[in-house]
A protein has these predicted regions:
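ATP-dependent small-molecule kinase phosphotransfer cores
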Residues: 42-101, 108
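Walker A/P-loop
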Residues: 22
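Post-Walker A helix-loop "phosphate-sensing" segment adjacent to the P-loop in P-loop NTPases
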Residues: 30-38
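ATP-binding Walker
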Residues: 19
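Extreme N-terminal, non-catalytic leader segments
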Residues: 1-10
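P-loop (Walker A) phosphate-binding loop of NTP-binding proteins
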Residues: 14-16
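NTP-dependent small-molecule kinase module
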Residues: 4, 142, 157-202
Length: 202
């Protein structure tokens, strides 16, 4: 594995639901990079094929709310009726090990992280077209029609915030590897930037 000589970087990967963030993370894990992938905690039900502790940390609501009360999350929010939170230990463990930390989070959560770690690298994934996004959500077959319509309405609002991010990466249909290569290059360029300061959670 390559050395990581510059200060560890916090990379915040965001974008609307269905844009392909999970697929991008799966491809990024295949690269030989000194990266630590944050696992988000959630109270939502596990989906077919997901693994507890790998895809998400699945918690019941009382356990989650207890952690929230103890201020054990970098940020947490209720999204689509379920709680999601980033355990502080997931971020600090990665940074303390000297690895760059990759954090996948929704747009609402990214705004909170920006306040706590303004010198992080914020990357926003966008679909090739809104029709592609609609098709991806339809193919999931895990959403009811009202839920899908809600996600599409929220996605429209979130896409309007793309300019607030440091970098936008297009994930077009059948071009996932190109999107991941773009993310990889963006991280490498940020690592080489002069004057970058260590990540401190405010």
């Amino acid at each position: 594995m390559p050395e990581n000589p510059s200060p560890p970087l916090l990379v915040v990967l965001s974008g609307p639901s269905g844009v392909g963030k999970d697929a991008a993370l799966n491809e990024m894990r295949k690269l030989d990079r000194p990266w630590h992938f944050v696992v988000t905690a959630t109270t939502r039900s596990i989906r077919p094929g997901e693994v507890d502790g790998v895809d998400y940390i699945f918690l019941d609501e009382p356990t989650f709310l207890d952690m929230k009360d103890k201020n054990e999350f970098v940020e947490c929010a209720q999204v689509y009726g379920n709680w999601y939170g980033v355990p502080k230990s997931q971020v600090t463990t990665g940074l303390d090990s000297g690895k760059d930390v990759i954090l996948k989070i929704d747009v609402q959560g990214a705004a909170t992280v920006r306040q706590m770690a303004p010198n992080a690298l914020f990357i926003f994934m966008v679909p090739g077209s809104f029709e592609e996004l609609r098709d991806r959500l339809s193919q999931r077959m895990t959403e009811s029609t009202p839920q899908m319509e809600l996600r599409l309405r929220i996605a429209t609002q979130e896409l309007g915030q793309a300019e607030l991010f440091d970098r936008q990466v297009v994930n077009s249909e059948d071009h996932l590897k190109e999107a991941v290569a773009d993310i990889d290059a963006t991280i490498s360029a940020e690592k080489q930037r002069d004057g970058r300061t260590p990540i401190l959670l405010l």
